[in-house]
Structure formats: C-alpha cells, structure tokens
Amino acid sequence: MNWITNYVRPRINSMLGRREVPENLWIKCPETGEMVFHKDLESNKWVIPASGYHMKMPAKARLADLFDNGEYESLPQPKVAQDPLKFRDSKKYSDRLRDSRLKTEQEDTILAGLGKVQGLKLVAVVHEFNFIGGSLGIAAGEAIVKAFERATSEKCPLVMFPASGGARMQEGILSLMQLPRTTVAVDLLKESGQPYVVVLTNPTTGGVTASYAMLGDIHLAEPGAEIGFAGKRVIEQTLREKLPEGFQTSEYLLEHGMVDMVVKRHDIPETLARVLKILTKKPVSAANDVTRGAIALAASA
C-alpha cells in the first residue's frame, strides 16, 4: 500500500498535471543575448526594450500597427498556379507551401491593406519573412501588382515594407519574371502622380532589392537592416577582399546616399505621414528639418 501511495499516485498526478510549454515564450536578443518574454516583445513592436534591436515583425502585426486604430481593408490574395514546375529539392515545394501556410496563417508571403495613416489614405504592402524567407514568387508578384493597381485606382500613395531573401528558386524563371512585372507596376503608379515610398526592413536582398525595393521616391530604413543584392560572404569570396565594417546595413547606406532616412519602428507611422503629406502637397504640422531635408535631397536627385 505504501508503494502505491508513495510512488504510483504522485507519478500519475504529475503526469496528468503536466502541461505543454511553448518553446518560443522567451526570445533571445541577437545583439546582447538578453532573454525577453514574448509578450513584452510584441507590446514593444518587436523591438528589444534594452538594446533597441529591431526583430523581424510579423506582416499582420505590421499592418495593424501602421494603420489608424489598426483598421484597414485587406486586399484579396490572387489565385495563381500552385507549384507549376513540380519542384523538389530536399523537400517537395508543395510541402514547403503547406508548412509555411500553417506556420504563418497566410496564403503566401505578401499581405496588402488599404487604410489611413494619420488620416492619409494609402495602400501598404508587407512581406512576411517567415513564409519561405519572404521570397518573391508568382503569387507574391501578382499580389504586389494588384496592390499597385488598387493604389492607382484609389489615387493614393503606396508604401512597401520588403523583407525578403530574393526570388523564389522553386519557381525558376517564373519567379524572375516578377521583377519586370513589379517594376512596370511601380512605373504606372508614378505616372498617375502618386508617391511610392519604401521602408526597407531586415533583410532586403536579392531580386527584391534589384527591383521594386529600390524604386521608391523616398527610401526609409529600419535601424540595422541588412540591405543589398548579394550577401556579404559571397561578395568577399568574389572580390577576395574584406568588406568595410557595417557594410550593407541601413546606416552604411544612409551614409553613402542610398537611403534617405533611418527611422526607428515606433516612429514609422508619424514619419510616413509627414513624408507623404509633403510629397502630396498637403498641410503638415512642424515636420523637422531632417525630414524636410531628406525629402528635398531625394526630390532633387
């Protein structure tokens, strides 16, 4: 009886009372190693409170944070061919799509919304990096083109938030075709007289950098974002030279004239509203000298 009381019953109770604990409750800062509770990170817009390090922000959270009161119209996801090349590497492409959809609860990497930022109507397009590295494929390209068409028909600006490793290799030449398609969409918006502003986030690389990510009228960037075409390691191996400290970061690109402003995530909605009001010649309250100066330089370039 003692054996049952002292061992079996406590063992059963402990097994029944055990609860599954999610693995991602605590998130480590890549810069300092500090562990941050995930709810604290989410409430701070995915910025590490102590170090100010900007973590990757989910696309849905970014749209909700950008628009006034988190209210916006979600633009529909276009229906396209799934896995047209029947591609397979270490895993079927169709399986990668299924897993990414379960993970992100999105059909593909692009989310787009129409709403207001400080009262100014605009279309926002956001990459979800957790969907196959935010890569540009047929579905993403079509969603981007449709978003530009909607901005053109609504006669409002479009703001792009790229976060991507580049073209989606599992779709081959069909993926690469999205580069000229999105470039034409940018041109059509500009021909209609509407501004196109890009907020470069970490990372923005590959074919996305070679197309619509660097075609904005104004380029903002989040602090510490990696922005470039080829990766640093590939460039160093090709040139057989060590690259400068901070190469391909948003701060480096600002210093060398490739980016107009580096803006902290908390300040992005207000900065965007000021920039767009200046570009559309609407009244703007007390825009600081840095904002006006950056826009003037970009306009004269």
UniProtKB/Swiss-Prot annotation:
Pathway, per record: Lipid metabolism; malonyl-CoA biosynthesis; malonyl-CoA from acetyl-CoA: step 1/1
Descriptive protein name: Acetyl-coenzyme A carboxylase carboxyl transferase subunit beta
Domain (CoA carboxyltransferase N-terminal) ranges: 25-294
InterPro entries attached to this UniProt entry: AcCoA_carboxyl_beta (IPR034733), Acetyl_CoA_COase_Trfase_b_su (IPR000438), ClpP/crotonase-like_dom_sf (IPR029045), COA_CT_N (IPR011762)
Gene: accD
SUPFAM superfamilies in alphabetical order: ClpP/crotonase
Record-level GO BP terms: fatty acid biosynthetic process; malonyl-CoA biosynthetic process
NCBIfam families: accD
Family annotation (PROSITE patterns): COA_CT_NTER (PS50980)
Role description: Component of the acetyl coenzyme A carboxylase (ACC) complex. Biotin carboxylase (BC) catalyzes the carboxylation of biotin on its carrier protein (BCCP) and then the CO(2) group is transferred by the transcarboxylase to acetyl-CoA to form malonyl-CoA.
One Gene Ontology cellular component annotation held by this UniProt entry: acetate CoA-transferase complex
Similarity-based family: Belongs to the AccD/PCCB family.
HAMAP family xrefs: AcetylCoA_CT_beta
